[in-house]
UniProtKB/Swiss-Prot annotation:
Known disease link: Developmental and epileptic encephalopathy 107: A form of epileptic encephalopathy, a heterogeneous group of early-onset epilepsies characterized by refractory seizures, neurodevelopmental impairment, and poor prognosis. Development is normal prior to seizure onset, after which cognitive and motor delays become apparent. DEE107 is an autosomal recessive form characterized by onset of seizures in the first months of life. Affected individuals have severe global developmental delay, profound intellectual disability, progressive microcephaly, and hypotonia.
GO cellular component terms listed in the entry, alphabetical order: extracellular exosome; glutamatergic synapse; synaptobrevin 2-SNAP-25-syntaxin-1a complex
Gene Ontology terms, MF aspect: soluble NSF attachment protein activity; syntaxin binding
Flavoprotein is among the record's keywords: no
Compartment(s) where it occurs, according to its Swiss-Prot or TrEMBL record: Membrane
Functional note: Required for vesicular transport between the endoplasmic reticulum and the Golgi apparatus.
Spans through the membrane: none
Signal peptide: none
Pfam families, A to Z: SNAP
Descriptive protein name: Beta-soluble NSF attachment protein
Keyword Protein transport in record: yes
Source taxon at top rank: Eukaryota
């Protein structure tokens, strides 16, 4: 069956489902099994949704899954309702990001009501990703990553919570909310430094926290660096710590060339990602005075 054929069949199923729903509202529904008609309508909406999916009509698929979700709720089938809202969200993601978020939020409300916080957290991440990539609303992405982290923490899924918090920290720093970023990097760094499997990552978190301090105030960065070395002695021998010391020295001397040279040397072994490049450039501008210079690190 071609896509047009699938769409025609889906439209017929939708019409049949609507008839079943109307019939269930009739005066005699109690005598003739109103719930049975609703169950049949649910099944038809779901079949129609899958037909629309095969035809790649994502909005129609999302709408059909939504209709099924509402009927499942009417039947007190919370789990089935939440599943249908998630299916609707996944379909809408390809056509209408805002509607996808609405459906996923509806699913989250049901899951939290059922005490299924780990699943709710997962869907908050999906919403955050839609805000990141489709709607480009970083403040809202941050809010959903934070909510996800809260739910994961409550369920003792600390590794998953930390992943979300690190996303929050990275975006907070980009938005110049440095104190928020510092608190998260320090907290995650402290949590990971005693874990044999994760302690290698701790140096990255302390490095990022120190850079955020540096952008705000050079003295803050010096004091933070001393604190991190005391907390986590392995940090002292890391390339990140050595780079920070060179950058602090260059900044103190207002020596832009020494700063650039130190960054280039570090980058030749460990490639700088976009976030690190942005932060290092912000610090460099304070050496050059009011952002003069070529705005480059190389």
């Amino acid at each position: 069956m071609d896509n047009a054929g699938k769409e025609r069949e889906a439209v017929q199923l939708m019409a049949e489902a609507e008839k079943r729903v109307k019939a269930s509202h009739s005066f005699l529904r109690g005598l003739f099994g109103g719930n049975t008609r609703i169950e049949e309508a649910c099944e038809m909406y779901t079949r129609a949704a899958n037909m629309f999916k095969m035809a790649k009509n994502w909005s129609a698929a999302g709408n059909a899954f939504c209709q099924a979700a509402k009927l499942h709720m009417q039947l007190q089938s919370k789990h089935d309702s939440a599943t249908s809202f998630v299916d609707a969200g996944n379909a809408y993601k390809k056509a209408d990001p805002q509607e996808a978020i609405n459906c996923l939020n509806a699913a989250i409300d049901i899951y939290t009501d059922m005490g299924r916080f780990t699943i709710a957290a997962k869907h908050h991440i999906t919403i955050a990703e839609i805000y990141e990539t489709e709607l480009v609303d970083i403040e809202k992405a941050i809010a959903h990553y934070e909510q996800s982290a809260d739910y994961y923490k409550g369920e003792e899924s600390n590794s998953s919570a930390n992943k979300c918090l690190l996303k929050v920290a990275a975006y907070a720093a980009q938005l110049e909310q440095y104190q928020k970023a510092i608190e998260i990097y320090e907290q995650v760094g402290a949590n990971t430094m005693d874990n044999p499997l994760l302690k290698y990552s701790a140096k990255d978190y302390f490095f990022k926290a120190a850079l955020c301090h540096f952008i705000v105030d050079e003295l803050n960065a010096k004091l933070a660096l001393e604190k991190y070395e005391e907390m986590f002695p392995a940090f002292t021998d890391s390339r990140e710590c050595k780079l920070l010391k060179k950058l602090l020295e260059a900044h103190e001397e207002q020596n832009s060339e020494a700063y650039t040279e130190a960054v280039k040397e570090f980058d030749s072994i460990s490639r700088l990602d976009q976030w690190l490049t942005t932060m290092l450039l912000r610090i460099k501008k304070s050496i050059q005075g009011d952002g003069e210079g070529d705005g480059d690190l190389k």
